[in-house]
Amino acid sequence: AKIVDKDPINGVPKVIGTTTNLLWHASEFGTKKFVYISSSMVYGDFKDGTREESNTKPTNIYGEAKLTGERLTKLFAKRDGLNYLIVRPSGVYGPGDLPDRVVSKFFDKAIKNEDITLHNGENKVDFTYRQDAAYGIVKAALSDVANTSFNITAGNATSLRTLAETIIEITGSKSEIKDIGMQSLYPMRGTLDISRAKDLLEYEPKFTLRQGLESYYDWLQNKI
């Protein structure tokens, strides 16, 4: 998200162009079902319990680009008779994560005993361990369900302050937390309703936030 928002001239064409390319090939070669990986950013500011049919009002460029990808998916589906599913993950983290994403960044600071900077520690994110996200996406791809959207998340949002405190506790760090206020780049978020995925896909996240963070920390230690 950050890359697209900071460099939209290059970032937006990659998101939309890649999606269009994949959709064209999916239609051209008779793909059984196209699964589009969108983002919770398409909702913009949202509260706990947000469902898939809730209003989509992105507050940043990345969210708008992903929402455009959703619209393109539906247009190709209507034009070419392509079955599709839209998956909206949130705050995915875990082994192999990019270093500038929030969980990776907090771990890096904690391991180095450096201050962890928050942009509004009360803002929440429905952090989802990567194995749960992958599990949900595979469930969606292999299901007989088509032509709808799913929130694939942990279904339990956590504040950035709690995230930082938990990482400090897991790592035994001496880091201090500094809250410098809200960034306009990111929306106010909460818990996404995953009942549709539970009912139709039998999706059930397996990792609590702490379990996911501990697993990620084990991986980071072995990597170091």
What do these predicted ranges mean?
Residues 45, 57-85, 111:
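Active-site Tyr-X1-5-Lys
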Residues 43-44, 60-61, 85-102:
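Flexible, glycine-rich beta-alpha linker
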Residues 209-224:
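Amphipathic terminal alpha-helices
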Residues 4-5, 84-91, 106-128, 151-153:
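A conserved pocket-lining segment of Rossmann-fold NAD(P)-dependent short-chain dehydrogenase/reductase
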Residues 1-14:
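NAD(P)H-binding glycine-rich loop region in Rossmannoid oxidoreductase-like domains
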Residues 20-61:
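Conserved Rossmann-fold NAD(P)-dependent oxidoreductase catalytic core, especially the SDR/UDP-sugar
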Residues 67, 92-105, 112-114, 130-131, ...:
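Glycine/proline-rich active-site loop of Rossmann-fold NAD(P)-dependent oxidoreductases
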Residues 120, 147-150, 159-164, 172-189, ...:
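C-terminal "lid/loop" region of Rossmann-like NAD(P)-dependent oxidoreductases
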